[in-house]
Amino acid sequence: MEECSCDNRFRRGNNEPAGFSLDEQWWAGNIRLVDLSGQLLGAHIAHAGLIAFWAGSITVLEVARYVPDVPFYEQGLGLLPHLATLGFGIGPDGTVVDTYPYFVIGILHLVTSAVLGAGGLFHTFKGPAILAEGGALAPKFHYDWGDTKQLSLILGHHLLLLGILCLAFVAKAMFWGGVYDASLGTVHTVSPNLNPADIFGYVFGFNHGQFNGLGMSSVDNLPDIIGGHVYIGILELIGGTWHILTKPFAIGAKPFSFSGEAILSYSLGAVGWMGLLSGFFVRYCDAAYPPQFYGPERSGAAAVQYILGVLLLVGHVWHATRARAGGEPVPYTPPAPQRGRFGMTRVAPAPARTFIGRGKPQPEPPKKKGLFGRG
């Protein structure tokens, strides 16, 4: 079997938007991996490792510089308030009595980042560039952007994971030590409010029957917050199971594009919308962001959420426009095996492609002639 050059592992794909040239775009990132399911998986895992490394390292750094007699928000700490809100390290009177749990959580994130980083490196340099060409179970996880069934399967697993994590937060609040209650200034377990009229009323701007323009961010008690997470977790588990077992209906899938850039635009739109919503929670919801930890004035932190949300929505429009102009995705076709010398089977080499940072397709290096003029 012929060897594949290192550059060919990052070869340009068939599903890049029309008019796009990697040679002319210095900011091109993972779009060069759009047709390489194995390489894109490696980038995805490595990205998760970077996020875990950031969270772990910043947590350990904040523990090292924490001053007990000064509130979190006056020290400019960003992650310890979140851990304190979850009830870690807080005494009966609502003050921080132990920072060791914060240190342990930071170290666990660093260990997790090392594992994820190793996985990202494996899939980048050792694993198959395209999962369909790998051995063992790798082909089972290959996907094409035009294969709506496989994409629905991937979405379903993501929803299942989110649902499990959401219900884990509920279990922490109900059984595993409780969470911090800003109204009482203590940590205690919470019994969720499961009244659907109360919980879903927030979606339409009603706080227990009274209209409030702040909508969901007007929630002012922990039972409603935990009850809302119960419903969200259950809905995500149902949605995840649904998407794993089904594929998009023709009438529902028709208005949508399923190219890589289109799915990126959908993700950016969802995260951007959540960024705008979270800004209202940061600014106005003391039950979710206790002023004892985050400060009574949180407009600056909320402004950061608004700015990031708007930037992500702009990215959504940008990538959605490019996806609409790019046409339908091209399905993956595995290379056809060819019969070589002595009846041995070899895989046909990949066609010449434009590599990142190169202006033209790179020709094959000339073969050196050996003894008697043989190649």
UniProtKB/Swiss-Prot annotation:
Keyword Thylakoid: yes
Major subcellular site: membrane
Transmembrane helix found in the keyword field: yes
InterPro entries in UniProt: PS_antenna-like (IPR000932), PS_II_antenna-like_sf (IPR036001)
Gene Ontology biological-process annotations: photosynthetic electron transport chain
Cofactor field: chlorophyll a; chlorophyll b
Co-factor binding details: Chlorophyll a.
Region (Disordered): 352-375
Compartment(s) where it occurs, according to its Swiss-Prot or TrEMBL record: Cellular thylakoid membrane
GO MF assignments: chlorophyll binding
Keyword list, A-Z: Chlorophyll, Chromophore, Membrane, Photosynthesis, Photosystem I, Photosystem II, Thylakoid, Transmembrane, Transmembrane helix
Family listed: Belongs to the PsbB/PsbC family. IsiA/Pcb subfamily.
Function: The antenna complex functions as a light receptor, it captures and delivers excitation energy to photosystems II and I. The Prochlorales pcb genes are not related to higher plant LHCs.
Subunit structure and binding partners: The antenna complex consists of chlorophylls (a and b) and chlorophyll a/b binding proteins.
Protein's UniProt name: Chlorophyll a/b light-harvesting protein PcbC
Origin species: Prochlorothrix hollandica
